[in-house]
Swiss-Prot record:
One Pfam family hit: CASP_dom
Family: Belongs to the Casparian strip membrane proteins (CASP) family.
Lineage: Eukaryota, Viridiplantae, Streptophyta, Embryophyta, Bryophyta
Cytoplasmic side: 1-53, 118-137, 206-213
Compositionally skewed regions (Basic and acidic residues) per UniProt: 14-25
Location of region: Disordered: 1-26
Ranges of the Extracellular topological domain: 75-96, 159-184
Main location: membrane
Keywords: Cell membrane, Glycoprotein, Membrane, Transmembrane, Transmembrane helix
Source organism per UniProt: Physcomitrium patens
Protein name per UniProt: CASP-like protein UU2
GO CC terms, sorted: plasma membrane
Amino acid sequence: MEDPKGAWQSDVFDNGRDFKPHDKAPANVTAGTTPPMYNVGAGGSEGNSKALSIISIVLRCLSIMFNVVSLGVIASNQGKSYFVVWRTLNSSNMQYLFAINVIVLVYCVVQLILSIINLVQGKMVLSGPTQPASTITYICDQGLTYMLMAGFGAGVALQASVDKGESGMLDCSGANEFCGKNKASAALSFLGFVCIALSANLNYLRLYFMAAK
């Protein structure tokens, strides 16, 4: 029968031998070692941030333009049927769309001013994806997106009833300027909605790029 202590006394175990303590753990990365993959491309993340900042400013400018034109069309649009003058703002649907466009316009102007100030001061145009300012901007963008979509739906519903002659307003069975402007104002509001909706997701697109690095 073999000695049961043979394995213990072999080189497999340290056999209680003392080892000299070390003050420092060995370095994980030695000279000449390739850097970890997640450190590569830090400059690319910064480039993505700059590109998204420019896109954010462009979307704000486009939204302002669409809303200004839409407000002008809604406020000035009127038509005449016999001795009755019809105005777009006589409709509660268009009043709602007009009010939403005003709110979105003011909000986008404020956001654009803040972006320009940050650019002049050399700061980031877009806040970090996890910062409170970014969350507040996202919530405002999302809320205004839904409000604009509701306003667009109200404008389309009004125009559909006008086309069918069920609104009590001008008859739009034929082509006329009044009905054309109604449709144009709704279309411009929809384009403003698209710009706000895209802007609402820019910070989270940045977060995706950061996580992909």
